[in-house]
């Protein structure tokens, strides 16, 4: 076992991006940046890294078949060492959160527990696993707002709701695209239980609610925001709409819906950030 294996199992690129997202979340919540956002970045980076490690710990048997190059099945990190490493990172992340705010500490603790629960149980639970991933993504915005206080946290609720619903839609469609592979490996997903068509319909409903929620920030950002987000909403609605009527994963993949949704979500982040800074 070497340092490289312990570094790789944290999926550093993924963890750093999550940490940077916390900085963006604070910027959206307040329109400004302070040195304290580096603490937010550190907490999210460490907790995300811990979540990645604990996920590999529980997926060790599956990765032996599907991803033998991952640190645990390749022998770079033992399973017991990975467990100890995961909880060390969790504890370090929670320790850093002590220097933020009580609200941030609470969110960090909830997310740490949810990451363990997701890896151990929820990942293989239809819909609830998807919802957990969506919540973890959306909670970064709550985390950024929480650092600025209750008022900023409440202002971020619509942004978090939009992110949760759009991410949930994408996660459901991704499962529908992977239905054959998941079925072959004995996985249990919502798409396997109800089929591609109904899954796409639920995903479309999620995006419709996300679009409805995207109108709320107009109350404090005004008309320029509404014009920008309306353009993005059209992309997201188009992306989800293309999936309607698909009855199999091949036709669903051909629509490019998940890719378009990802682009739409990134564009919405740009609109939120520009609105927070300039409006």
UniProtKB/Swiss-Prot annotation:
Group of enzyme by EC: transferase
Stretches that traverse the bilayer: 5-25, 27-47, 90-110, 127-147, 148-168, 198-218, 219-239, 259-279
Needed cofactors: Mg(2+)
Name of this protein: Digeranylgeranylglyceryl phosphate synthase
Membrane topology of the entry: Multi-pass membrane protein
Subcellular location: Cell membrane
Originating species: Methanoregula boonei (strain DSM 21154 / JCM 14090 / 6A8)
InterPro entries registered for this protein in UniProt: DGGGP_synth, Prenyltransferase_related, UbiA_prenyltransferase, UbiA_sf
PANTHER family linked: CHLOROPHYLL SYNTHASE, CHLOROPHYLL SYNTHASE, CHLOROPLASTIC
One cellular component term from this protein's GO annotations in UniProt: plasma membrane
Cysteine disulfide links: none
This protein's UniProt keywords: Cell membrane, Lipid biosynthesis, Lipid metabolism, Magnesium, Membrane, Phospholipid biosynthesis, Phospholipid metabolism, Transferase, Transmembrane, Transmembrane helix
Pathway per the UniProt entry: Membrane lipid metabolism; glycerophospholipid metabolism
Protein family: Belongs to the UbiA prenyltransferase family. DGGGP synthase subfamily.
EC number: 2.5.1.42
């Amino acid at each position: 076992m070497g340092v490289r294996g312990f570094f790789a199992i944290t999926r550093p690129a993924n963890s750093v991006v999550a940490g940077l997202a916390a900085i963006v979340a604070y910027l959206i919540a307040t329109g400004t940046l302070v040195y304290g956002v580096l603490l937010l970045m550190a907490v999210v980076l460490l907790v995300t890294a811990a979540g990645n490690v604990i996920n590999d710990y529980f997926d060790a048997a599956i990765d032996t078949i599907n991803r033998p190059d991952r640190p645990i099945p390749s022998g770079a990190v033992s399973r017991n060492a990975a467990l100890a490493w995961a909880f060390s990172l969790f504890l370090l992340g929670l320790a850093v959160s002590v220097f933020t705010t009580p609200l941030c500490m609470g969110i960090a603790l909830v997310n740490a527990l949810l990451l363990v629960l997701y890896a151990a149980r929820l990942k293989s639970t239809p819909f609830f696993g998807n919802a957990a991933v969506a919540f973890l993504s959306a909670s970064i915005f709550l985390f950024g707002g929480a650092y600025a206080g209750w008022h900023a946290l409440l202002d971020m609720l619509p942004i978090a709701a939009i992110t949760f619903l759009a991410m949930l839609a994408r996660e459901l469609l991704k499962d529908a695209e992977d239905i054959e592979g998941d079925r072959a490996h004995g996985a249990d997903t919502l798409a396997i239980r109800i089929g591609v068509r109904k899954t796409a319909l639920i995903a479309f409903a999620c995006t419709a609610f996300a679009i409805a929620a995207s109108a709320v920030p107009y109350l404090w950002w005004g008309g320029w925001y509404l014009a920008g987000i309306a353009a993005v909403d059209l992309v997201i609605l188009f992306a989800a709409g293309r999936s309607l009527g698909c009855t199999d994963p091949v036709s669903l993949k051909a629509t490019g819906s998940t890719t378009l949704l990802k682009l739409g979500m990134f564009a919405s982040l740009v609109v939120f950030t520009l609105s927070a800074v300039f409006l």
